[in-house]
Amino acid sequence: MTADPQTTAVIKKVATNGIRVICEHIPTVRSVAAGVWCCTGSVAEPPALNGISHLIEHMFFKGTERRTAAEIAAEIDGVGGALDAFTEKENISFFAHVLYEHLPLALDLLSDILLKATFPREEFVKEKNVVAEEIRLYEDSPDEKIHDLVMGVLRPGEAIGMPVLGSFETLKAIGRDDALRYRNEIFTADRIVIAAAGYVDPEEFIAMVEDYFAAVPGPVGATSRKAAAPPISQPACVKDTEQTHLCVAVPAIPFGHPDRYVLAALTTVLGGNASSRLFQKVREDRGLAYAVYAYGRGFHDSGALVAYAGTSPATALETRDIVLEQFADLAAHKIGADELKRTRDFLKGTLMLSLESTAARMGRNARHEIYMGRHVSLEETLAGVDAVTADDVLRVAGEIFSNQPAVVAIGPNADAVVGA
């Protein structure tokens, strides 16, 4: 059998307790990636407890009623697997990657940390210190921090702009009881998607999920988290850095919008690869930056297109102006036939290459369920990319670049970059 991704099948079933189960059987591999996704992230947090989702993610691995933290690590290491987690604006996910014969162990571990994590008091104090160091690392990494900053400026006073890590102040305010209470509130069956991709029988996987995750509770009483608005982000952060880091962003479209393939093409043309306009004009033609790129972010009800560059303070204004010029040019002129073909082929090629990873497939399937409520096949995606026209790109560019761009900067002359 060839390794054609189109020969695989994606099965969805709703478990008895309401958990959505997504499974993709891939006959050409011998591993399985399985993930538990909670459709709640930092965007749902009370502003005073910003960062609590990320802290809970850490605490899941610090011991359960059956296993110590060391035993959790030893069991997954003992089969050559991987166990990890991440927190985003709208999701929390923890996942395992193992050989197919060890899938029962992976699900046992995932269900154990979800249902039986104890959040030991001494570990809770220690882990808050670990997260504080993570925040310090983040504060010392302007090329990372600026991407949260730009969302806060683009959506002022809205939760989507809150950092996933929280702040020193909010981290200090989070108590163990807060974390346990919030964990119990958000990790309910109606918010959970469990996905797997790899050498796994869908019916067997669904049966195992029914068994291992049967105790996941149903929804609890809804709690309003809109009482307080997060603080307004400031667009300029003056800091003694070697470079000035800048982002220019505009509001875009939600994850599942019909124009999502058009936006992907527009973003690619702008700054998605080494042949993109920003890379060529900023780096290759003028040598102004090493890192320069653009990306799109799609959420449930909003999105953003963001361009980033890190450059010398002396050339930050010039770099910013090039970005704005490219926004204007794409809104006013059609891209050429060769540029369109290259962009389509790039999007299709990078997608096909990513599908060689079971973890990437698992995540793709989970996100489609979370944001669109259905599976989006490879054939549908490829057809969507092929259907993008130069007129489409011009139309979407005109729509989103007509918005006032948010300009943010971190560096010695950040005020000038933002205000000039």
Residue ranges of model-derived segments:
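N- or domain-start disorder-to-order transition segments that initiate the globular core
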Residues: 1-31
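Charge-rich, well-structured scaffold segments of protease-associated domains
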Residues: 9, 14, 25, 69-224, ...
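His/Glu-based metal-binding/catalytic segments typifying zinc-dependent metallopeptidases
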Residues: 26, 35-37, 221-277
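M16/MPP (pitrilysin/insulinase) zinc-metallopeptidase core fold and M16-derived inactive scaffolds
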Residues: 33-97, 269-288, 299
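Small-molecule pocket liners
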Residues: 34, 192, 243-246, 303-305
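Short, charged, low-complexity patches
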Residues: 45, 49, 103, 107, ...
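Histidine-centered active-site/metal-ligand motif
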Residues: 54, 58, 147, 245
